[in-house]
Amino acid sequence: MRRVYTNRRAHHEYELLERFEAGISLTGSEVKSVRAGGVDFRDAFARINGSDVDLEGLYIPVYKEATYNNHEPRRKRRLLLHREEIEKLRRGLEQKGLTLVPTRLYQKGRYFKVELALARGKKLHDKRRADAERTVARELREL
């Protein structure tokens, strides 16, 4: 694994329950742009459409060196999962309050992979408690 992009906001906004690895279908200009850097997870989420899983809202900047055949920066991108994994995700999403959030984008061999997580949104008091626990742990390490 070489270049890794993480969704740091997902760890703050959500309680991550279960993780899945999925391939992602990218065009040539998207691959070059990801290698150049600048991926943004800010509004990214995954949705199950029939037998497919789509990643929406992931921002991959336009590749500067590409010609007229460049990609749309926030287009839907298809995720590649086994049928059993899709059914497991579908059963998980049927539970109230769960959503599918991308947590990492990385290169594994020649291919780019996305790590998805079934997640439950945190309330404000949960975020504050997590911040307080991190602060206490940091102070204990410093002693």
Swiss-Prot record:
It holds the Pfam family SmpB. Coiled coil: none annotated. It is found in: Cytoplasm. It comes from Deinococcus radiodurans (strain ATCC 13939 / DSM 20539 / JCM 16871 / CCUG 27074 / LMG 4051 / NBRC 15346 / NCIMB 9279 / VKM B-1422 / R1). Keywords: Cytoplasm, RNA-binding. NCBIfam families: PRK05422.1, smpB. Required for rescue of stalled ribosomes mediated by trans-translation. Binds to transfer-messenger RNA (tmRNA), required for stable association of tmRNA with ribosomes. tmRNA and SmpB together mimic tRNA shape, replacing the anticodon stem-loop with SmpB. tmRNA is encoded by the ssrA gene; the 2 termini fold to resemble tRNA(Ala) and it encodes a 'tag peptide', a short internal open reading frame. During trans-translation Ala-aminoacylated tmRNA acts like a tRNA, entering the A-site of stalled ribosomes, displacing the stalled mRNA. PROSITE patterns: SSRP (PS01317). Its main location: cytoplasm. The lineage of its organism: Bacteria, Thermotogati, Deinococcota, Deinococci, Deinococcales. GO terms for cellular component: cytosol. Belongs to the SmpB family. One of its GO terms (biological process) is trans-translation. This is SsrA-binding protein. InterPro entries: SmpB, SsrA-bd_prot, SsrA-bd_prot_CS. The keyword Cytoplasm applies. It comes from the Bacteria. One of its GO terms (molecular function) is RNA binding.
